[in-house]
Design a protein with these regions (language model features):
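RNase H-like, Mg2+-dependent phosphodiesterase core
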Residues: 1-207
Length: 207
């Protein structure tokens, strides 16, 4: 299925007026926050080249970021930091970040399209009326837009804030994912204050 407004149009036909797409980025890395974005696009919106952010090059994501912001009726970006991820769990952190993004929209959303197969964790859940769509970032235009905003925003935070704070870990190169280089830096320096300790079991087991 190509990325389109099928789900948005279906929700509007059911009587909802402000339909947002929601996605998150950074659930898998060993450090830093998880980010989420919510985007409301106008009816009939077209954004050439937009797809699931994971299927796009970094250059393409960067180019589309301002286009999405300009075309959106409303958008918002939120995050939950590594301390809260460790204190709760990554699923709850993802849900909290997504609901925070929805709540921060300049226009209140009355319906949300959520990427994934879950809408709640142990300590957080999506409270806005919604539907969950497996592979939504490759099907819904507004979810795809949210995936780009979340991914680019997190990458910028890692590169512009965390990498200068902890240059020895070379966060800008791997964005915190469990790459060979990242594990080598962990072996050499141990965890930083921004590492998710609950995510380091694999590293600890191989020491």
């Amino acid at each position: 299925m190509s990325v389109n407004l099928h789900y948005e149009d279906k929700a509007r036909a059911a009587g909802f007026s402000a339909v947002c797409g929601v996605d998150e980025a950074g659930a898998g890395p060993l450090m830093g926050p998880v980010y989420a974005a919510a985007v409301i696009l106008p009816e009939g919106c077209e954004i050439e080249g937009l797809n699931d952010s994971k299927k796009m090059t970094e250059k393409k994501r960067e180019a589309l970021f301002p286009v999405i912001c300009e075309k959106a009726v409303a958008y918002a970006i939120a995050s939950v930091d590594e301390k809260e991820i460790d204190a709760t769990d990554i699923l709850s952190a993802r849900m909290k970040a997504m609901q925070l993004a929805i709540d921060a929209l300049q226009i209140p959303a009355d319906y949300a399209l959520i990427d994934g197969n879950r809408d709640h964790g142990a300590s957080a859940k999506i409270t806005t009326p919604h539907e969950i769509i497996v592979g939504g970032d490759g099907a819904s235009l507004s979810i795809a837009a949210a995936s780009v905003l979340a991914k680019v925003s997190r990458d910028h935070y890692v590169v512009e804030v965390l990498d200068p704070m902890y240059p020895e870990y070379q966060f800008a190169r791997h964005k915190g994912y469990g790459t060979k280089l990242h594990y080598q830096m962990l072996d050499q320096y141990g965890p930083s204050p921004v590492h998710r300790m609950t995510f380091l079991k694999k590293w600890e087991a191989r020491r």
